[in-house]
């Protein structure tokens, strides 16, 4: 997996994408984690997916900031994600403790906009981040808790869709 925020995004992504090409392995990249409209890493990840011909090989983890953008921007990114056959992993409790900010942005929950991604036919899986670490010392990695956060924050109440998120899409995302 990658975390381009901590380094130069372009250099980091070039290394990851070249590695994926040389090994044939899928990429899982943590992007748009800060819940702000100035982040555009999901879009940049799509651009790198196209640049390297990695369609169907890339998963965006988090993409919380995508929800902070205007609907027209989100729809443009969703179209790019469809064309890139990109998938997403939502870690709903990872940013639930997001501190208040004075920034003006679209009102939204601090989670991956899974409801919109699903409406655009984009695969969404469930995950957990920061398990029993310095950031989330009481997080135990419960996928049921994460799924509950996802269904409540995105109002995804279709049981068949939730099963698909928890099982089928998860298997697809990790390549089994």
Where does each model-flagged region fall?
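Histidine/acidic residue-rich metal-binding segments in metalloenzymes
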Residues: 1-59, 63-87, 104-126
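Short Asp/Glu-rich motifs
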Residues: 38-40, 100-101, 136-137
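His/Asp/Glu-enriched, well-ordered alpha-helical/loop segment
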Residues: 47-57, 94, 98, 109-176
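Short, basic, glycine/proline-bearing loop/turn elements
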Residues: 62-64, 92-101
